[in-house]
C-alpha cells in the first residue's frame, strides 16, 4: 500500500520565490529573467515575426515525422528499475523502483480554457486516460493550460482515489476547487515551496519528492496571474533519481545546485520546444542549446527532450527543429555522450540499462 507521510524538510540553499501579497515572483538572483511579455510585446510579435512552424495538415506525414505508438498499462513494463514513456508535450509516465507517477498530465485537445480557441493538439496521446496504470502520485509544475488539465486531473483521481498530488504553493486551493483533496477525500494534496521536500512510502520503500526552483510564471484566468507558484520536481529513490524541470528559463546557478545536492540524476525530462523568437521566449522557455547546458549542470546521466511536437504553442520555430537541433548539437559535443540526451517517440519505453 502507498502511505504518504506528512513530514517535510527544507533546503535553504535553493532560491526562494518572492511573495508580494497574493502573487509570486522570480527572485532577483534569476538574472536571465526579463519579465512576462507585455501587451506591446504581443503586438510586436504579431506584426513583425514570421511563423515558421509549418505543421503539415496531412496526418500521414505527421505519422512518419512524429510517430505515436498506442499503448496501454499492459505495455508499460520493463525489467529495469527505472523506465518511462513520453505521452506528449510535458506528460511523462515514470516507474522508479516500483513507484509509478506522471508529470503534468494533459490530455486536452486544446491547451485552453475553451474548446474552440487556444493551442490545438496536433499529435494525440499514445495512451488513453482510462488505460493508464495505477498511479501512486503525480507532480504538477504550474497552472498554464498546457501543463494543468482539469479534466485529466479529475479523471486520474477518480481512477486512483489514493493518489497523492504534489503541487507548488497556491495550487492546493485550485485542486480543492476541483473536489480533490477536500475533507472526506482519500486523495492527498501536498503543497510545497521551492527547496521543500516530502516523503512518500510504498511497500517499505521511501521516496523523497523535492519541489525545485524554475524561472517561469503562472496564470489561468484574467485576474490570477502569478497567484500560484511554478516549479520543477525531483524524485529520489533508494538508488534512482529523476528530475523534471517544468517550464523554465535558464537560471544556471540553480541548475548547478540541483546537480550538486540531488544529482546525479539517472533520468531527466527537459523541455526543448516553444523557444522562438528568443527576445519573446528566452525568459520563460529554454531552447535546445540551453537544455543541453541544463542536462550537464544537473549531472544527468540521461535526459529526454519534451515540450515539443504536440501542440501549436504559438512559437515560431519549425515544428521539427527542437528534435533536429538537439541531435545536431549533441552530435557536436565532445564533452557529452551524444546518446545521453535524446528524444523518444510517443509511447516508446525508455529504460535505464545500467543495472
Curated annotation (Swiss-Prot):
What is the reaction catalyzed? Answer: an N-acyl-1,2-diacyl-sn-glycero-3-phosphoethanolamine + H2O = an N-acylethanolamine + a 1,2-diacyl-sn-glycero-3-phosphate + H(+); 1,2-dihexadecanoyl-sn-glycero-3-phospho-(N-hexadecanoyl)-ethanolamine + H2O = 1,2-dihexadecanoyl-sn-glycero-3-phosphate + N-hexadecanoylethanolamine + H(+); N-(5Z,8Z,11Z,14Z-eicosatetraenoyl)-1,2-di-(9Z-octadecenoyl)-sn-glycero-3-phosphoethanolamine + H2O = N-(5Z,8Z,11Z,14Z-eicosatetraenoyl)-ethanolamine + 1,2-di-(9Z-octadecenoyl)-sn-glycero-3-phosphate + H(+)
Q: Which residues are recorded as binding Zn(2+) 1?
A: 142, 144, 216, 247
Q: Under the cellular component aspect of Gene Ontology, which terms does the record hold?
A: cytoplasm; neuron projection; neuronal cell body
Domain of life the protein comes from:
Eukaryota
**Cofactor(s) in the UniProt record:** Zn(2+)
- What follows loss of this gene? No strong phenotype in the nape-2 deletion mutant, however its overexpression alters growth and lifespan when grown at 15 degrees Celsius compared to 25 degrees Celsius.
Q: Which family does it belong to?
A: Belongs to the NAPE-PLD family.
Described function: D-type phospholipase that hydrolyzes N-acyl-phosphatidylethanolamines (NAPEs) to produce bioactive N-acylethanolamines/fatty acid ethanolamides (NAEs/FAEs) and phosphatidic acid. NAEs are bioactive lipids that are involved in diverse physiological processes such as growth and lifespan.
Please state what the protein is called.
N-acyl-phosphatidylethanolamine-hydrolyzing phospholipase D 2
Specify the species: Caenorhabditis elegans
Q: Which gene encodes it?
A: nape-2
Amino acid at each position: 500500500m502507498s502511505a504518504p507521510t506528512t513530514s517535510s524538510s527544507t533546503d535553504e540553499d535553493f532560491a526562494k520565490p518572492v511573495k508580494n501579497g497574493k502573487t509570486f515572483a522570480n527572485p532577483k538572483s534569476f538574472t536571465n529573467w526579463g519579465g512576462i511579455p507585455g501587451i506591446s510585446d504581443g503586438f510586436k510579435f504579431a506584426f513583425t515575426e514570421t511563423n515558421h512552424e509549418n505543421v503539415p495538415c496531412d496526418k500521414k506525414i505527421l505519422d512518419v515525422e512524429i510517430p505515436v505508438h498506442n499503448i496501454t498499462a499492459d505495455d508499460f513494463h520493463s525489467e529495469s528499475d527505472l523506465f518511462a514513456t513520453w505521452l506528449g508535450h510535458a506528460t511523462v509516465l515514470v516507474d522508479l523502483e516500483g513507484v509509478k507517477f506522471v508529470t503534468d498530465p494533459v490530455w486536452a485537445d486544446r491547451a485552453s480554457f475553451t474548446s474552440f480557441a487556444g493551442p490545438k493538439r496536433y499529435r494525440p496521446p499514445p495512451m488513453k486516460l482510462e488505460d493508464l496504470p495505477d498511479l501512486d502520485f503525480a507532480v504538477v509544475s504550474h497552472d498554464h493550460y498546457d501543463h494543468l488539465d482539469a479534466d485529466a486531473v479529475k479523471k486520474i483521481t477518480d481512477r486512483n482515489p489514493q493518489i497523492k498530488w504534489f503541487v507548488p504553493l497556491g495550487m492546493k486551493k485550485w485542486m480543492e476547487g476541483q473536489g480533490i483533496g477536500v475533507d472526506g477525500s482519500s486523495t492527498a494534496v501536498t503543497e510545497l515551496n521551492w527547496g521543500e521536500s516530502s516523503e512518500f512510502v510504498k511497500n517499505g520503500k521511501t521516496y523523497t519528492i523535492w519541489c525545485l526552483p524554475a524561472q517561469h510564471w503562472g496564470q489561468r484566468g484574467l485576474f490570477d496571474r502569478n497567484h500560484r507558484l511554478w516549479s520543477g520536481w525531483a524524485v529520489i529513490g533508494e538508488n534512482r533519481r529523476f528530475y523534471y524541470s517544468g517550464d523554465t528559463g535558464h537560471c544556471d546557478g540553480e541548475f548547478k545546485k540541483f546537480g550538486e545536492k540531488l544529482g546525479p540524476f539517472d533520468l531527466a525530462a527537459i523541455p526543448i520546444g516553444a523557444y522562438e523568437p528568443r527576445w519573446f521566449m528566452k525568459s520563460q522557455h529554454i531552447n535546445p542549446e540551453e537544455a543541453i547546458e541544463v542536462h550537464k549542470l544537473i549531472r544527468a546521466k540521461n535526459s529526454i527532450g519534451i515540450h515539443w511536437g504536440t501542440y501549436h504553442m504559438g512559437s515560431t520555430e519549425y515544428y521539427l527543429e527542437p528534435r533536429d537541433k538537439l541531435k545536431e548539437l549533441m552530435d557536436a559535443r565532445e564533452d557529452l555522450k551524444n546518446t545521453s540526451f535524446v528524444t523518444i517517440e510517443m509511447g516508446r519505453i525508455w529504460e535505464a540499462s545500467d543495472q
